[in-house]
Amino acid sequence: MATVTGNRITLNPREMPSRWYNVEADLPFRVPPMMSPSGYPITARELAPLFPKQIIEQELNAKSRTFNIPKEVKQAYQQWRPTPMFRATALEKELGTTAKLFYKVESGSPSGSYESNTAIPQAYYTKKAGADGIVTGGAGGVWISAIGHAASLFGLESRVYSVRKLGSDRARGDAYGRVWGVDVQASPSENTRVGKHQFKKEGADSGSIATALAEAYEEATLNPNVKFAIPTLMGNTLIHQTIVGLEAQRQLAAVNEAPDHVIGSIGAGSHFGGLIAPFIPARIQGRNTRFVAVEESSSPSLTRGVYTEESADAAGLMPQVPMYTLGREYSPPGVLAGAMRYHGVAPIVSSLYREKYIEAVAHGQIESYSAGLMFTRAEGIVLSPHAMYTVKEVIEEALRVKEKGTDDTILFTVTPAINAESSPYDSLLDGVMHDEKPEEASLKKSLGRFIGRG
């Protein structure tokens, strides 16, 4: 049974979900498939050299509503899951709102974040496939820690191509990588053809998640002893993240609540998708729940992108993904919320947005960090950069609810700042933070590739 103590709602470990949820099976519309270079839907055979068979099944199976969480994965999850939920009464009082604010704290994992939710099953299935190692790309310390810890659990070697442009954040990620024995390579690197090309083209102060993924993907295609892992975007990562939404659903039910608004920041969208997915069936059945994705204003894939097929990586090596995108050639500015610097949004989330189940807004650094500071001073949790964007929109919505005089329930997740990330408020409090706008020339060039398509 769930336990309610003051503002805190906790689940008994026995109540942790034993199956992940596949929302695609319940959707009243078809999510377009990834496409192979041949122009046909990608097949299991084409993915087999890169991914374990269980990951491929989760990726391509649109009919199974649930997937079993393996015993070994569940045991690893139980180190920190279920995670707690809180009623944000102090923030409600600060805002004078009639809204009821509930936030789930995704922390306590070895990575300090929700990214372990998908790193662990990907590493487990990689080991089960008989591979020696796992290779991936990402945006700094949290994913490095997540994949490093997961690989160490199952006796795998690990390599992460980490975005060079993140500078000091990446350096802290490198340090955490050493703890877990990760071989961290600054991307673009000299290890791959993709990396060499991008380094020559853009120089040392460059890099993007798309380039890091391209390097990892290239290495995986050339080394049969490793499997490729991805932190977000693909359907299997969203399925793994549904453990967050499933727990949240049970915690709200324990206090007889259901959300009127579910709000979350978005990079490629798997965590946001995992949070909202268990609440989608009620929306399909008629409940008017709003789902709001919050973008960084310099990486506005939903609010300014186009819906088309585009590669997940900068070099176009990976399958073509149906998504809202700014184009793989877009080079976003180096904002502190590095995980939000991606050129596209997960196919399921993109389809939900296209079908009007999801709304999207974009916020800048200063307004988001200012909102994060208000949350920290009210609730006592120092937030990670991307969580501040969530909180910014939560505060905006809470004030709108106040104006309406209703008592809407708002659900969101936060992750605390961890040592692998930058000190989150220094530049704001020092008065040197500035908002990053989309790099219009890069955006125009990247989106120009899609003119006349479709």
Range-by-range predicted roles:
Residues 202-215, 225-281, 285-288:
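Glycine-rich ThDP/TPP pyrophosphate-binding loop and its adjacent helix/strand module
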Residues 121-131, 145-157, 178, 276-285, ...:
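Alpha-helix C-terminal capping segments
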Residues 205-232, 281-284, 288, 293-381, ...:
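Active-site/ligand-binding loops adjacent to catalytic centers
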Residues 2-131:
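Positively charged, low-complexity intrinsically disordered leader regions
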Residues 118, 126-165, 258-271, 386, ...:
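A short, small-residue-rich loop immediately preceding and capping a beta-strand
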Residues 266-274, 365-432:
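Claisen-condensing/thiolase-fold acyl-transfer catalytic domains that form or cleave C-C bonds
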